[in-house]
Amino acid sequence: MTLRDDSVLVNIFRPSLLALIKKAMLLWLGLITVVAGFAPPPSYRPFVVNNFDLNDYHPHNNILKFLNSIQNNRTRVRSLGVSSERRHIPIVKISALDETKPPVDVFVDAGFHAREWISIATALNLIYNLSRSNDWPSNINLYIVPVANPDGYEYTRTVDRDWRNTRSILAPNLKSCRGVDANRNFPFHWAGQGTSNDPCSEIYHGPRPLSEPEARVVAQFLSKRANSLKVYVSLHSYHNAILVPYGYRYNARPRDYNELMWTALEMTQAMNSLYGNNYTAINSAQLYPAAGCSDDYAKSLGIKYVYTMELTTGEYGGQYVGFETPRELIQQTYDEVRAALLTLMWKTVQE
C-alpha cells in the first residue's frame, strides 16, 4: 500500500478527520474564515451602473432616474399609475426576443409592504440583469413593478423605517392613522381572515376593495392581461419561503395546488443550490391566513403559476435584523430569486 493512493486515504482516515484536514487546508489558503464554527456572512460589494449602485438602497426619485437610464430597444419604462401622494408607480417591460413564437407574459411586483426594502432591490437587479441577458426563454414578455408602494417606501426612508402600509388619508379625523395594507386590499375574499377593520392596524384592509391606487393599478393590469399572463410573483420579506395560494383561510386550495407545490419545490431547490439558505415551499395560510392578498387575487383570475416569495431569514451574521436587511445580502438574494424565476419561466414555456 502507498499513501499516495486515494482509496487508501479514504480507508485510513475517517470522514470526520478528512473534513478537518480539508478545512485546515482551506484556512491555510485563506479561502474561508471560521467564526464560531460558521463561514462569515457575505460582504458588501458595489455594483454600479450609471452612478446607481444596484447593491444598495435608494430613494424613489433615484430609482425612477435609473430605470429611465437603462431603457433600450428591448426595455421600456412607463408609469402604471400614481400613488395617493402622486408618486409614479413604474412598470418595466422587457420584451420577448423571439416574436415568431407565441408570447408568454410573466409579472413580478415588489415593495407592496414599504419596509421590505430587499424586495425592491431584488426587483431592480432583476430588471437590469435580465434586460441584458438571453439565458431565459426568448418568447417571454417580462413585466416588473419594482416599487408598488412608493409613498410608504419614502416614508420608511425619512420618518419611520418600520412603516408597512400606504400613506393615504382615509378621513380628516383619521390623520393620525394613515394608510392601508395594500396587500389586504384586493377584491378576493376581501376583509376576511388575517385582516382588520381598525384603520390604525398594520393589517387594515381599507374602507373598500381597491381603495388604494397602489393595489388598484396592479389589479387592473392583471385583469386586463389575465389570458396572456402565465406567471405572477410577488416579492416580500422575510421568511425564506415560497408561498403557494390560497392564503385567505386554512385548507383553501386551488384545483392545481399539487402542481403549484411541486413547481415551488423545484424553485426552492434552485435557490438552495446557491448558498444553502434552506428556502421552503409552503401553503400561504400555513405562514398565517391573510385575505385580500394580491397572489390570491391573481390566482382567482386564472393565472396559472402564482407565488409570493418571502425573501431572507431576517438574520445576518447570526443577528436578528428583521425587515432591515443589510445591503450585504442584496446580491445573494437576487441570485436566489433569479434562479427560482428562471426555473419557473423555463417550466412555463415547455408546457
Per-segment meaning from a language model:
Residues 1-31:
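Classical eukaryotic N-terminal signal peptides for Sec-dependent ER targeting/secretion
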Residues 20-351:
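M14 metallocarboxypeptidase catalytic domain recognition
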